[in-house]
C-alpha cells in the first residue's frame, strides 16, 4: 500500500507548510506535508508512512509537497538483488576493517564534535555548521520509532586505533531499514565513508531478511542526492507506485 488514502492512518492529520527556501536546489521554494500528531506515529505507522514517501527529522514526519516541483523522489534499494559496482567493491575493501557499534540514540560529545566538523567542511554556510547541542539532539536523537545509532571506529590494529570515523542514524521498519542521517570524518580525502555506510546498511538488511533500504529522496539535479542512483537495483516512488529506476529514468547514471 503506497497511496495515502489506502493507509490505516485515519487518526492522523496532514497539513502543508508555508513555502521556505529549498535546501537542495538553489533558487527554489519548497513546501512539506507534515503528519500530526507526532505521538501517534509509532514504529508501525511510520513504516507505512515511509512506504508512502515520508521521512522524519527528529519527531517531525514529512514529505515534499512543493507547488511547482517534483524533483524529490523517494527511493529504496532492493536488497536481495543488489549488485555492487566496482567502485562500491573498492569502498567495501577499503573500510571493511572499521568496527561498527550499534546503540540506542544517545548523546556523545565526540559524536557532536564530529557532526560539527562534518557540517563545517562538507556543508559550510548551509545553516547547520553552527548547530547547538540542543539542535543536534532534536534533529538526530529524538525519535518515537525504532531507531538505532551506529558508530564506526578504526580497529585496534590500526595506527589510528579507536578513532571515530562515522556516525549513522537508522530506523528499523517493517520492510527494511531507513537511512536517517550519516556524518563522517571529512578530512580523509581518499575515504569513501558515505558509500561504505550504505553498503553496511544493505548488508544489515540482508542479515535481518528485510527487503529494502530506504535512502530518502533521489534528486537528479542535486549532486548531494543524485549519488543514490549508483546503488542498483533502485526503486522510485512515482505517482503512488514503487517502480524500477530504469523504467522511470531510462538512461544510465554515470559513476
UniProtKB/Swiss-Prot annotation:
Entry GO CC: cytoplasm
Transferase in keyword set: yes
The UniProt record lists the keyword Acyltransferase: yes
A molecular function GO annotation: leucyl-tRNA--protein transferase activity
Subcellular location: Cytoplasm
Documented EC number(s): 2.3.2.29
GO BP terms in the entry: ubiquitin-dependent protein catabolic process via the N-end rule pathway
Catalyzed reactions per annotation: N-terminal L-glutamyl-[protein] + L-leucyl-tRNA(Leu) = N-terminal L-leucyl-L-glutamyl-[protein] + tRNA(Leu) + H(+); N-terminal L-aspartyl-[protein] + L-leucyl-tRNA(Leu) = N-terminal L-leucyl-L-aspartyl-[protein] + tRNA(Leu) + H(+)
Key words of the record: Acyltransferase, Cytoplasm, Transferase
A Pfam family the protein falls into: ATE_N
Stated family: Belongs to the R-transferase family. Bpt subfamily.
PANTHER family cross-referenced by the UniProt entry: ARGININE-TRNA-PROTEIN TRANSFERASE 1, ARGINYL-TRNA--PROTEIN TRANSFERASE 1
Listed name of the protein: Aspartate/glutamate leucyltransferase
Chain's gene name: bpt
Amino acid at each position: 500500500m503506497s497511496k495515502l488514502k489506502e493507509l490505516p492512518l485515519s487518526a492522523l492529520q496532514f497539513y502543508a507548510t508555508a513555502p521556505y527556501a529549498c535546501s537542495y536546489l538553489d533558487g527554489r521554494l519548497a513546501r512539506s506535508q507534515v503528519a500530526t500528531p507526532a505521538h501517534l506515529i509509532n514504529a508501525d505507522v511510520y513504516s507505512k508512512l515511509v512506504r508512502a514517501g515520508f521521512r522524519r527529522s527528529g519527531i517531525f514526519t514529512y514529505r515534499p509537497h512543493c507547488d511547482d516541483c517534483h524533483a524529490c523522489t523517494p527511493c529504496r534499494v532492493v536488497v536481495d538483488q543488489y549488485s555492487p559496482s566496482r567502485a562500491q567493491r573498492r569502498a567495501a575493501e577499503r573500510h571493511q576493517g572499521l568496527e561498527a557499534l550499534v546503540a540506542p540514540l544517545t548523546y556523545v560529545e565526540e559524536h557532536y564534535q564530529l557532526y560539527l566538523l562534518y557540517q563545517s567542511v562538507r556543508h559550510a554556510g548551509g545553516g547547520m555548521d553552527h548547530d547547538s547541542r540542543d539542535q543536534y539532539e532534536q534533529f538526530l536523537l529524538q525519535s518515537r520509532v525504532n531507531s538505532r545509532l551506529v558508530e564506526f571506529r578504526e580497529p585496534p590494529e590500526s595506527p589510528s586505533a579507536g578513532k571515530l570515523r562515522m556516525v549513522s542514524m537508522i530506523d528499523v521498519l517493517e520492510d527494511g531499514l531507513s537511512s536517517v542521517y550519516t556524518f563522517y570524518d571529512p578530512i580523509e580525502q581518499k575515504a569513501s565513508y558515505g558509500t561504505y555506510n550504505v553498503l553496511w546498511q544493505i548488508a544489515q538488511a540482508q542479515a535481518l531478511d528485510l527487503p529494502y533500504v530506504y535512502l530518502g529522496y533521489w534528486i537528479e539535479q542535486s549532486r548531494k542526492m543524485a549519488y543514490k542512483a549508483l546503488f542498483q537495483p533502485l526503486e522510485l516512488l512515482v505517482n503512488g507506485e514503487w517502480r524500477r529506476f530504469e523504467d522511470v529514468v531510462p538512461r544510465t547514471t554515470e559513476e
